[in-house]
């Protein structure tokens, strides 16, 4: 799995060409990872903390395959599948680059060949033409298993010129690359295509396969840390008093509740509480200008 972002397209194509003659594959670039429950976990897919791994039921193999270009949405859909009483057969994120080395077509064919997989859950977005290849596979019965899809980016049709979403590929330069066109071609091919994210969740809940009762509990083994030495770093910004986290001499929760985000950001940056309201307003103005107000994010569901 290649986790790195901004890998030159030339390098990706070279890797793709080199792998053609070998019985191996690479997921990425810009991928969050590859996951096969109870067998393999590469990357942050499914979570990084013990609590997240337990909640994602990674020790319980199932029959639902999850695919998406978006790393964040891959994890979100994994949790959605689990929340609907289903379990994963495997999951992966292609990465948001224009030329992922392991394509959605290859992933769908792998799921079709996997005897454990009964349902394929796919989160796509505007840009590119991968969905047309997927629709062709479905219509030609090369993919016979249940396919549930959501295609993000319909909001792009509201703009006079096509907006660039967060991923390099997420730009509909032509009509065939729009989310509306992709939804239609997949639906016409026989896939189940949701018109809203809530409908997408409902489709997953009603999908084929086994529903698992959430009864089994797993204990997370905590490593014995009694041999750890105290840190030799003294901080005047953060600390704790009787187990309560402190920021600049004030309780963390109270500090976050009583002050604006601009005040907190400026104070932490300077290492002391700011006194100037003009500075606070200036920082607030800068943050408002920099924040992403529009739909230009990967996997936008609005």
Model-identified regions with their sequence ranges:
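Catalytic-core regions of core metabolic enzymes
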Residues: 1-254, 260, 268, 272-302
């Amino acid at each position: 799995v290649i986790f790195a972002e901004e890998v030159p397209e030339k390098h990706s194509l070279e890797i793709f060409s080199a792998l053609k003659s070998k019985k191996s594959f690479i997921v990425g670039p810009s991928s969050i990872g590859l996951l096969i429950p109870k067998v393999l976990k590469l990357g942050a897919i499914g979570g990084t903390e013990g609590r997240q791994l337990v909640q994602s039921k990674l020790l319980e193999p199932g029959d639902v395959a999850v695919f998406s270009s978006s790393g964040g949405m891959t994890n979100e859909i994994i949790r959605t599948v689990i929340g609907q009483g289903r379990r994963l057969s495997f999951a992966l994120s292609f990465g948001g680059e224009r030329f992922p080395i392991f394509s959605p077509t290859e992933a769908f064919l792998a799921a079709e060949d996997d005897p454990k997989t009964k349902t394929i859950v796919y989160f796509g977005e505007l840009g590119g033409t991968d969905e047309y290849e997927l629709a062709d596979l479905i219509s030609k019965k090369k993919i016979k298993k249940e396919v549930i899809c959501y295609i993000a980016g319909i909001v792009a049709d509201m703009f006079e010129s096509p907006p660039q979403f967060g991923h390099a590929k997420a730009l509909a330069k032509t009509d065939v690359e729009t989310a509306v066109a992709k939804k239609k071609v997949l639906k016409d091919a026989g896939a189940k295509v949701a018109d809203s994210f809530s409908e997408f969740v409902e489709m997953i809940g009603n999908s084929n396969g086994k529903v698992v009762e959430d009864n089994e509990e797993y204990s997370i083994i905590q490593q014995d840390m009694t041999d750890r030495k105290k840190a030799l770093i003294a901080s005047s910004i953060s600390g704790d008093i009787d187990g309560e986290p402190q920021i600049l001499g004030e309780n963390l929760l109270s500090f976050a509740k009583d002050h604006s985000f601009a005040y907190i950001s400026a104070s932490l940056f300077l290492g002391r509480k700011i006194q100037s309201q003009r500075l606070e307003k200036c920082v607030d103005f800068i943050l408002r200008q920099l924040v992403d107000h529009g739909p230009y994010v990967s996997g936008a569901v609005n």
